[in-house]
From Swiss-Prot:
Binding site for Mg(2+): E54, D56, D114
Chief localization: secreted
Disulfide bonds: C74-C80, C76-C219
Compartment annotation: Secreted
Essential cofactor(s): Mg(2+)
Name recorded for this polypeptide: Dermonecrotic toxin LiSicTox-alphaIA2bii
Length: 302
């Protein structure tokens, strides 16, 4: 009887925890570690509180993804020159996001690839998408066999490079893994007019899985006007945006302003600063750090 009571108690607590988790009405927040371009930085940023990272991807003249590299200039207070070969970084990232791996970081649930397509001609965008997909499929998703589990956002700086999205999707389909597009989202990062961004997605045939970024280097100031426009689109009921993130946010006051505006993600050089603000009395009952169970393509409903 005692054993039965103990089992019942454990089951009751588990059920209560599950109900409480589903009943949590706080907005999930993605704390996005900025400019994570060396494998060693993955652990560094996650250990500081990031549940997602942003990684720069440079391309060679033939539209092959080549390095995880930003270069000069970059954010104030950061080294701009850390890098890896792209495929080596993907392997390190796979280790960090594959359950059971010795390097596994359970908190790391989303990766934004900041695609530096400015070096490419417009007519290379589709090919860049195909080559990016082939590399991710082999080195990150392990050809669909127990690869990394993180969600991926393809962030494109130029609206004219929307064919990259189709190239990426077509390549995964060609290689027999169209289901992996369930793990892929999209972002145009050039701070273009929201309407123009929407038109680019129409041309690309994309509806859903849309993150909208807004921001500027931490060396400069930028207001929240466009962030609020993106949030209005997200919350309109008929907009194309699912999530909004703001970059680069390093100060507590800026973090509070972004949270007050209603963002879903904050990209930062200092994840611990964002974590501290989320734990403040004014925010801890409204926001929480997103977990893997939070769908990054789902528009949060209050």
């Amino acid at each position: 009887i005692a054993l039965i009571l103990v089992c019942w108690s454990v089951l009751s607590q588990a059920a209560q925890t599950d109900v409480e988790g589903r009943a949590d009405k706080r907005r999930p927040i993605w704390i996005m570690g900025h400019m994570v371009n060396a494998i060693a930085q993955i652990d560094e940023f996650v250990n500081l509180g990031a549940n997602s990272i942003e990684t720069d991807v440079s391309f060679d003249d033939n539209a092959n993804p080549e390095y995880t590299y930003h270069g000069v200039p970059c954010d104030c207070g950061r080294s701009c020159l850390k890098w890896e070969n792209f495929n080596d970084f993907l392997k390190g990232l796979r280790s960090a996001t594959t359950p059971g791996n010795a390097k596994y970081q359970a908190k790391l649930i989303l990766v934004v690839f900041d695609l530096k397509t400015g070096s490419l001609y417009d007519n290379q965008a589709n090919e860049a998408g195909k080559k990016l997909a082939k590399n991710l499929l082999k080195h990150y998703w392990n050809n669909g066999n127990n690869g990394g589990r993180a969600y991926i956002v393809l962030s494109i700086p130029d609206l004219n490079h929307y064919p990259l999205i189709k190239g990426f999707k077509d390549q995964l389909t060609h290689d027999g893994h169209p289901e992996l597009m369930d793990k892929v989202g999209h972002d145009f990062s050039g701070n273009d007019a929201i309407g123009d961004v929407g038109n680019a997605y129409k041309k690309a045939g994309i509806s859903g899985h849309v993150w909208q970024s807004d921001g500027i280097t931490n060396c400069l100031l930028r207001g929240l006007d466009r962030v609020k426009q993106a949030i209005a689109n997200r919350d309109s009921g008929n907009g194309f945006i699912n999530k909004v993130y703001y970059w680069t946010v390093d100060k507590r006051a800026t973090t509070r302003d972004a949270l007050d505006a209603g963002v879903d993600g904050v990209m930062t050089n200092y994840p611990d600063v964002i974590t501290d603000v989320l734990n403040e009395s004014a925010y801890k009952n409204k926001f929480r750090v997103a977990s893997y169970e939070d769908n990054p393509w789902e528009t949060f409903k209050k």
